[in-house]
Design a protein with these regions (language model features):
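Extracellular structured ligand-interaction cores
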Residues: 154
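Domain-core detector
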Residues: 1-150, 162-185
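Catalytic core of tubulin tyrosine ligase-like
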Residues: 157
């Protein structure tokens, strides 16, 4: 790419962490193309970074170990690019709805509905606008603008095209207390 695509993982690591950004971008491409698993790419990235810096410092002052920072960066980058491709696929098909995945142990927030992944997971949303049956994707999940929401920092959720009247949501409600317990482990 001759330097045209950089910081694809959109890490917020500071400018002093350019090596971290470069290594995360390389790991992202290895995972995204199927050349390596998340774990293999993370381990390779950690090994390379271990030669350069022991921890990653973010502009917020937050610090992470290399393993955590690299894996989070790869996961976030893959989720964001997958989300962008799904939105484009929906546009190409003329569809305006998506179904968000769900999992036990989804992030919980009692103060921010966007950061409360447990609250919006497993549901169908409108990409543009909203209708009588489904809420707006951006308003409900923060996608693609809020880094605390869907496909944001360390988010494991994905979403797929959904056509009301044809597609079906087979997600079963997850008990909120069971989810909270799993999240807090």
């Amino acid at each position: 790419t001759a330097g045209e695509i950089s910081n694809i993982t959109r890490t917020t690591a500071g400018a002093t962490n350019q090596a971290f950004i470069d290594i995360c971008d390389a790991a992202y491409w290895k995972v995204r193309t199927g050349a390596q698993s998340y774990t293999a790419a993370m381990l390779e990235g950690v090994k390379a970074l271990g030669q350069l810096q022991p921890i990653v410092r973010y502009p917020s002052g937050h610090k992470d170990t290399l393993e955590v920072a690299v894996l989070r960066s790869i996961r976030t980058g893959v989720a964001q690019s997958s989300g962008n491709m799904t939105i484009q696929q929906c546009k190409d098909m003329g569809w305006n709805h998506v179904l968000v995945s769900q999992h036990l142990g989804a992030r919980v927030s009692d103060t921010d509905p966007i950061a409360d992944h447990a609250g919006w997971q497993g549901k169908v949303y409108c990409i543009d606008g909203k209708d009588a049956q489904f809420d707006n994707l951006l308003d409900a999940t923060g996608y693609p603008e809020n880094p605390l929401g869907l496909c944001g920092y360390n988010c494991c959720h994905s979403f797929t095209p959904f056509l009301p009247g044809v597609s079906q949501n087979h997600n079963k409600p997850i008990d909120t207390e069971a989810n909270r317990r799993a999240y807090e482990l």
